Amino acid sequence: MASAAPGFGRRGRRVAAASILVAGMVTGAGGFAAADPAPAPTPAAAVALFTLTAMPAGWQTRTDLHPSLQIQLDGHATKRADSTAQPVEGTVPADVIGAAAAEVKALAAVDMGTPEQDDQGTSIIDYMPQAPDQDVHLIVYAPEISDGLTDDQKASRKRFDDLFQRLLNAFVPA
């Protein structure tokens, strides 16, 4: 029996040490969770409803690109004439925004083609309503090039460009 007592003692000390270690880990984990709260979700108003971006040829090496126009759900908008220009605040009328939303959804279903020369810039219209499953991202590669495209693709690209210009031209500076 005398030999069993030291084994029980060592086992008891191991259990006690393990219990202290586990208690410390649990307490520490709770402390970390309280110290780093989950980031707050981005408010819907902070995400632009429409973002229009025109990237020139050779854009891959540039770091100064900005959206040409960002439109919020309430019609508030920010426009930049080019990547070096200061942003201008203003609005876009609600009727233009509504028509643009319908046209973006229609354009999502068409083929705008990709020319063989695809390194000649890119135009993008991002439509991001509050329901993320309704997002539409339209991209036209080499918007000035039409070689190798079908007539339907050319017509779809013209509709895209017309919408892009309509939104830019509807901007009213504050």
What role is predicted for each listed range?
Residues 95-114:
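Charged, amphipathic alpha-helical segments
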Residues 2-3, 31-32, 36-57, 110-174:
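Short, well-ordered, aromatic-rich surface patches in folded extracellular/luminal domains
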Residues 36-95, 174:
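Extracytoplasmic low-complexity, Pro/Thr/Ser/Ala/Gly-rich segments
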Residues 63, 88-96, 117, 152-159:
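Extracytoplasmic/periplasmic, Sec-exported soluble proteins
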Residues 71, 100, 104, 125:
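Short, structured motif recognition centered on aromatic/hydrophobic residues
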Residues 76, 105, 130:
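Residue-level marker of positions within ordered structural domains that often coincide
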Residues 1-37:
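Secretory targeting and sorting signals
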Residues 73, 94-97, 127-134:
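A short, structured loop/turn motif at beta-sheet edges
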